[in-house]
Protein backbone atom coordinates (compact mmCIF):
# COMPACT_ATOMS: atom_id res chain seq x y z
CA UNK A 1 0.00 0.00 0.00
CA UNK A 2 1.34 3.41 -0.95
CA UNK A 3 1.75 6.06 1.75
CA UNK A 4 0.43 9.31 0.28
CA UNK A 5 1.68 12.66 1.60
CA UNK A 6 -0.83 15.01 3.19
CA UNK A 7 0.74 17.92 1.36
CA UNK A 8 2.03 18.87 -2.08
CA UNK A 9 4.90 21.09 -3.17
CA UNK A 10 5.05 22.53 -6.67
CA UNK A 11 7.73 24.84 -7.98
CA UNK A 12 8.73 26.89 -10.99
CA UNK A 13 11.36 29.50 -11.80
CA UNK A 14 10.17 32.85 -13.16
CA UNK A 15 12.58 35.70 -13.92
CA UNK A 16 15.25 34.21 -11.66
CA UNK A 17 12.87 33.74 -8.74
CA UNK A 18 12.01 30.27 -7.46
CA UNK A 19 8.28 30.16 -6.74
CA UNK A 20 7.16 27.37 -4.44
CA UNK A 21 3.51 26.62 -3.70
CA UNK A 22 2.68 24.52 -0.64
CA UNK A 23 -0.78 22.96 -0.34
CA UNK A 24 -2.43 20.44 1.96
CA UNK A 25 -1.96 19.74 5.65
CA UNK A 26 1.16 20.62 7.63
CA UNK A 27 1.10 19.03 11.04
CA UNK A 28 3.59 17.32 13.34
CA UNK A 29 6.56 15.72 11.59
CA UNK A 30 5.13 16.83 8.25
CA UNK A 31 6.59 20.31 8.83
CA UNK A 32 10.13 18.97 9.03
CA UNK A 33 9.63 16.70 6.02
CA UNK A 34 8.27 19.63 4.00
CA UNK A 35 11.22 21.81 5.06
CA UNK A 36 13.66 19.12 3.92
CA UNK A 37 11.91 18.78 0.56
CA UNK A 38 11.88 22.55 0.18
CA UNK A 39 15.64 22.61 0.85
CA UNK A 40 16.16 19.98 -1.87
CA UNK A 41 14.15 22.04 -4.37
CA UNK A 42 16.11 25.20 -3.53
CA UNK A 43 19.45 23.40 -3.91
CA UNK A 44 18.40 21.76 -7.19
CA UNK A 45 17.49 25.18 -8.61
CA UNK A 46 20.49 27.00 -7.08
CA UNK A 47 18.00 29.64 -5.94
CA UNK A 48 18.88 32.89 -4.19
CA UNK A 49 15.39 34.42 -4.25
CA UNK A 50 12.32 32.45 -3.23
CA UNK A 51 8.60 33.09 -3.07
CA UNK A 52 6.94 30.66 -0.70
CA UNK A 53 3.17 30.63 -1.26
CA UNK A 54 1.57 29.08 1.83
CA UNK A 55 -1.97 30.40 1.38
CA UNK A 56 -3.39 26.91 0.87
CA UNK A 57 -1.63 25.20 3.79
CA UNK A 58 -3.88 23.89 6.56
CA UNK A 59 -2.38 23.72 10.05
CA UNK A 60 0.68 25.60 11.21
CA UNK A 61 3.32 25.49 13.89
CA UNK A 62 2.48 27.69 16.85
CA UNK A 63 4.84 30.54 17.75
CA UNK A 64 6.85 28.49 20.26
CA UNK A 65 7.25 25.65 17.78
CA UNK A 66 8.46 28.05 15.09
CA UNK A 67 11.19 29.28 17.42
CA UNK A 68 12.19 25.72 18.40
CA UNK A 69 12.17 24.57 14.78
CA UNK A 70 14.43 27.42 13.66
CA UNK A 71 16.87 26.86 16.53
CA UNK A 72 17.10 23.09 16.06
CA UNK A 73 17.28 22.84 12.27
CA UNK A 74 19.51 24.44 9.70
CA UNK A 75 17.85 24.84 6.33
CA UNK A 76 19.15 26.53 3.17
CA UNK A 77 16.11 28.80 2.99
CA UNK A 78 17.23 30.60 6.16
CA UNK A 79 20.08 32.19 4.17
CA UNK A 80 18.08 33.40 1.16
CA UNK A 81 15.90 36.33 0.18
CA UNK A 82 12.43 34.98 0.88
CA UNK A 83 8.98 36.43 0.33
CA UNK A 84 6.18 34.53 2.04
CA UNK A 85 2.70 34.89 0.54
CA UNK A 86 -0.10 34.14 2.97
CA UNK A 87 -3.68 35.09 3.78
CA UNK A 88 -4.37 38.13 6.00
CA UNK A 89 -5.73 35.92 8.80
CA UNK A 90 -2.24 34.47 9.25
CA UNK A 91 -0.43 37.81 9.56
CA UNK A 92 0.63 37.00 13.14
CA UNK A 93 2.98 34.36 11.72
CA UNK A 94 5.05 37.16 10.18
CA UNK A 95 5.83 38.43 13.67
CA UNK A 96 6.55 34.93 15.01
CA UNK A 97 8.94 34.18 12.15
CA UNK A 98 10.71 37.53 12.55
CA UNK A 99 11.03 36.97 16.32
CA UNK A 100 12.58 33.57 15.59
CA UNK A 101 15.28 35.34 13.59
CA UNK A 102 14.27 34.55 10.03
CA UNK A 103 14.66 37.38 7.52
CA UNK A 104 11.46 36.54 5.62
CA UNK A 105 9.18 39.29 4.34
CA UNK A 106 5.42 38.70 4.43
CA UNK A 107 2.95 39.55 1.65
CA UNK A 108 -0.70 38.88 0.91
CA UNK A 109 -0.32 39.68 -2.80
CA UNK A 110 1.98 37.49 -4.88
CA UNK A 111 2.63 40.25 -7.42
CA UNK A 112 3.88 42.54 -4.64
CA UNK A 113 6.16 39.72 -3.47
CA UNK A 114 7.56 39.34 -7.00
CA UNK A 115 8.13 43.10 -7.31
CA UNK A 116 9.91 43.20 -3.95
CA UNK A 117 12.22 40.29 -4.82
CA UNK A 118 13.01 41.73 -8.26
CA UNK A 119 14.13 44.94 -6.55
CA UNK A 120 16.63 43.04 -4.37
CA UNK A 121 20.18 42.47 -5.52
CA UNK A 122 21.36 38.88 -5.49
CA UNK A 123 23.69 37.97 -2.66
Listing of model-derived features with the role each one plays in the protein:
Residues 2-123:
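Amphipathic, Lys/Arg-enriched alpha-helical "gate/interface" segment within cytosolic domains
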Amino acid sequence: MENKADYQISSSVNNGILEVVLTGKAQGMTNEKMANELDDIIKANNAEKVIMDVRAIEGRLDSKEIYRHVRNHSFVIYELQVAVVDIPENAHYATAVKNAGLPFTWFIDIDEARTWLKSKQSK
